[in-house]
Amino acid sequence: MKLLVVAVIACIMLIGFADPASGCKDCSCVICGPGGEPCPGCSARVPVCKDLINIMEGLERQVRQCACGEQVWLF
């Protein structure tokens, strides 16, 4: 039990001294993705979102028709 308490305290101390955003200091990495600028080679958020929604709707239609056996008129 004492070893567990010591380990937990040591972890808390190590986490407290660690820099969570540490990375390379000399690289020119730019944060990209959903919260910022689009990553290189990616479209803006709205077109990507629309494309993904269309893909998911098509997949849902295939699952309902082919795997579940629903008739087309039910969609």
Curated annotation (Swiss-Prot):
Cellular component aspect of the GO annotation: extracellular region
Cleaved signal peptide residues: 1-24
GO MF annotation terms: bioadhesive activity
Keywords: Signal
Gene Ontology biological process: puparial adhesion
Source organism, top-level taxon: Eukaryota
Name this polypeptide is given: Salivary glue protein Sgs-8
Species this chain originates from: Drosophila melanogaster
